[in-house]
Regions:
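Transmembrane-helix motifs of polytopic, lipid-linked glycan transferases
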Residues: 103-120, 361-364, 430
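Transmembrane-helix signature of polytopic, membrane-embedded enzymes
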Residues: 116-135, 175-183
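Polar, glycine-rich mid-to-C-terminal structural blocks
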Residues: 203, 233-293, 305
Length: 836
């Protein structure tokens, strides 16, 4: 590359970076004032991670991989990924430098720009294509609710594809093709390392499907059209495979603990039987497909409010029939109500918004089906179709069951509608490939008129049809309308129709203008060449304005708050202060002032019985379903007639499982004293008898029939233990508490079986009695137990999972290898030039 061209490319790159910074920070200027997005999921993270973060900050040389803050205790595997050993983590952190979420948008824009360039798209159009990828509405929705890891994984998605495409295209060159191919493969490994580092395996899974499809398309191409490049294809594929594995291996410090943890979680399935069948490994199919995209929702890919938009949708209070009705009924604060009306009427339980890809993007994609002849079309079309079939989930159960039962790991994922993130890259890629070829005069004007007319009819025509006859979309009623007054439901319907018609008209106009610009540029035949560039740039501008303004529906100034206000839910209440006055180092709290199993706010202050996590331990989930929910409801019931805390305490029902979890305090409100549960069994106790269960079903059933204070239920997979009944002189106490280490002191007149009110987990908890290793057993379905010798002894339990140590070692070696490969491949690009 000559110096002039190099300087030009550097200028284009720097210009793109400046533009993307302006777009990213211009979209969320609030971050420049120190504000943050009021994200519900991040609020939940703050609660569940508080104990871990506090400990790790105070003990950096002894980090904890366990927390007792949620669900009685669980590994931090699904909470934190800050594990040592990965030297490429510094690169990741550097890329994320800046104010979030602006930095997420910037990374997505830059990666998509590189992808468009790798596909051979001219840089002015590549800028527009980058916006079409990064500013899809779904990205703003997940940022607003706090799915940050998902957004990071999506942001690095196009980086991986860009390196993949560059690698295979490098095999076509005549000079230095091997050096370029090696560089591409190494960049692929680095990009994949970053994408996996985001720690959202489901997005990575969809990315893997696209990667495999592209490799397959390349293989078919060399076998059918370019047999002289078969050798180069296999060289490139081998390099991609090897270096890609190295890139993934840099994350083994996270992946190995996760692999150990997943089989024990809800994603690993339950050991219990249901209707005579043992549940297989993986999520329940109904649970996994609860959020399935309906076939009837697909038009909202180009008409955002086709199905009402969001479950809590903002409407114009001056035009809304619902708001007018409420005003006539004397309702106050209608302006606030107008910000959150139940407009969504699709088949999903609820949604933050549609998967709007952009009306012009969809038009260009359809146009690409007819106008673009390159092999990439089939890659993108097949990828799009597979993603749609996955996303519709329970609306095409035959395909879903096939994927669930056949595809490796697929049954570990939920919210199948997420597969539509694939369309965020496939639709803009094919659409802007087509636009690029049109601008470059690769399309015959006469042929274009016919094909573009068909594309316009299929997209703009459909939008116009729904504007004129909106009832073609359905009856505009939602499941959430049930129980509402007919007059209110009718108002909802009118608003939903208005939302559809408004967006259908806007989408029609956008598509019509884009089509008109292309016709103006190509017809007549002697039209000046500059028209095509003007048309292309104008279309890019339209895409930007449309996605920018539509995205503001889901992420705008109203969603930002100050860090101080964001932390208010975690402010210490009077009841928290009262509980913390207890000198005992460990006990559990049941907070009835929140949704017990869907809130981690209590975990910020206490060791909670509840919490929120879609990856909680399956045995604890079984305990919730079989016992805890019933016992909590019984507590609620006993409180109905009580007028004082003392009356609540006196009237507490029998709650044997809560007692075994050492649930000492029950919170009924932030300003009230806590209810003291005198029946809590404490941190540890000796039992008189072991009750052996013949099956998991029998094991959990015994919890409802035995006396957990004096009997321990032992599963069939646990070894036999010999011990004598407890004596009145026996004692066992918790001497010190840390999330990753528990110390007990006990005295026993004979050999004993001790049960601890701590959650059992097989991979990592190691125990010693006076320095001698001892086995940690499982009792009472979820609790730890130990067979202890007679006498006076000290017990130390430490959580030291081998997976973290081994994973860190592999990550260390892999990250060093990847960094060296990157340096060598970059050097290899310059060596031939220097020799000349």
């Amino acid at each position: 590359m000559d110096q002039k061209k190099l300087l030009k490319n550097i200028g284009i790159g720097l210009g793109a970076i400046v533009l993307f910074l302006l777009l990213s920070y211009g979209y969320v200027p609030q971050v420049l004032d120190g504000k943050i997005v009021n994200q519900s999921d991040i609020s939940g993270y703050m609660g569940m991670s508080h104990e871990m973060n506090e400990w790790n900050a105070a003990h950096p040389d002894d980090p904890t991989y366990w927390t007792d803050s949620m669900f009685g205790g669980m590994p931090t595997t699904a909470i934190s990924t800050q594990n040592g050993g990965d030297y490429t983590q510094s690169i990741y952190n550097l890329l994320l430098t800046g104010k979030r979420p602006a930095t997420y948008l910037f990374i997505a824009l830059l990666g998509a720009f590189l992808l468009m360039l790798a596909l051979g798209i001219s840089w002015p159009l590549a800028l527009g294509g980058a916006v079409a990828v990064a500013f899809c509405s779904y990205n703003f929705q997940i940022i607003q609710v706090g799915h940050n890891t998902k957004m990071q994984a999506i942001a690095f998605f196009p980086w991986v594809l860009a390196a993949l495409v560059y690698t295979y295209r490098s095999t076509k060159g005549k000079g230095r093709w091997l050096a370029k191919t090696l560089l591409g493969a190494v960049l692929f490994g680095v990009a994949l390392s970053m994408q996996v580092k985001a720690n959202h395996q489901q997005i990575t899974y969809y990315l893997a499907i696209l990667v495999l499809l592209y490799a397959l398309v390349e293989l078919i191409d060399v076998l059918t059209k370019n047999k002289d490049r078969i050798g180069r294809f296999f060289v490139a594929s081998a390099l991609l495979l090897v270096v890609g594995c190295v890139g993934i291996a840099t994350n083994v410090n996270k992946l190995l603990p996760l692999a150990k943890y997943t089989p024990h979680t809800m994603r690993g399935g339950s050991e219990l039987t249901q209707d005579g069948d043992v549940k297989g490994g993986g999520l329940d199919l109904d649970y996994a497909t609860a959020w399935s995209y309906g076939w009837e929702e697909l038009p909202n890919l180009m008409i955002p409010n086709f199905n009402g938009g969001a479950s809590a949708q903002a409407v114009d209070p001056a035009k809304s029939e619902t708001i007018k009705l409420l005003k006539r009924a004397g309702q106050s604060n209608t302006r606030e109500i107008a910000k959150s009306l139940p407009m969504y009427w699709g088949p999903q339980p609820f949604t933050a918004g549609p998967m709007y890809m952009g009306a012009i993007t969809v038009f260009l994609f359809i146009l690409g089906l007819f106008c673009y002849k390159g092999k990439e079309k089939w890659w993108l079309v097949v990828g799009t179709v597979i993603a749609v079939l996955m996303a519709v989930g329970n609306h095409f159960m035959a395909f879903t069951k096939f994927c669930f039962n056949v595809l490796p790991l697929y049954n570990k994922f939920r919210t199948v509608s997420m597969a539509l993130v694939v369309l965020q890259v496939t639709l803009p890629m094919l659409g802007f490939l087509a636009l690029d070829r049109i601008v470059k005069d690769w399309v015959e004007p006469k042929d274009f008129l016919k094909k573009s007319g068909i594309a316009f009819a299929l997209t703009g025509g459909l939008c116009l049809l729904f504007f004129l006859i909106p009832t073609l979309a359905g009856d505009f009623t939602a499941a959430s309308d049930a129980g509402q007054q007919d007059v209110l439901v009718e108002a909802f319907q009118q608003d939903r129709i208005a939302l559809l018609r408004q967006d259908a008209l806007v989408s029609f106009i956008l598509i019509a203008v884009a089509w008109g610009l292309l016709l103006w540029a190509l017809l007549p035949k002697d039209a000046p060449r500059y028209r095509k560039l003007i048309a292309g740039v104008a279309i890019c501008a339209l895409v930007t304005v449309n996605l920018f303004t539509t995205g503001k529906r889901y992420l705008n100034a109203d969603h930002f708050t100050t860090p101080k206000d964001f932390g208010k839910p975690f402010a210490e209440r009077p009841v928290d202060q009262m509980i913390k006055a207890d000198p005992d180092p460990s006990y559990r709290v049941l907070d009835l002032s929140v949704n017990v199993f869907n809130s981690s706010i209590p975990s910020y202050h206490h060791k909670s019985v509840g919490g929120y996590s879609p990856a909680k331990l399956q045995r604890y989930q079984d305990l919730i379903e079989h016992y805890l929910t019933g016992e909590i409801n019984a507590v609620y019931g006993s409180m109905q007639e009580a007028k004082t805390i003392d009356e609540v305490e006196a009237g507490l029902p029998a709650t044997p499982v809560l007692n075994a979890l050492n649930t000492r305090y029950i919170v009924v409100g932030g300003d009230y004293a806590p209810v003291y549960n005198k029946a809590a069994l404490g941190n540890a106790w000796f039992v008189d008898e072991a009750v052996r269960a013949a099956s998991p079903d029998e094991e959990i059933a015994f919890l409802g029939s035995v006396d957990l204070r004096h009997q321990a239920v032992i599963g069939k997979d646990m070894p036999d233990v010999t011990f004598a009944p407890a004596d009145s002189t026996d004692t066992i106490v918790l001497a010190s508490y840390a999330p990753n280490e528990l110390r007990y002191h006990y005295k026993a007149a004979g050999n004993r079986l001790a049960v601890f009110s701590e959650i059992y987990y097989p991979d990592g908890w190691k125990a010693q009695v006076d320095g001698t290793p001892a086995d940690v057993l499982r009792s009472d379905w979820t609790l730890r137990s130990m067979a202890l010798p007679a006498g006076e002894h000290d017990i130390v339990m430490r959580f030291e999972p081998d997976s973290y140590r081994v994973g860190a070692g592999i990550s260390r070696a892999s990250s060093i290898t990847l960094i060296l490969l990157l340096l060598l491949s970059l050097g290899g690009m310059f060596l031939p030039a220097r020799k000349k």
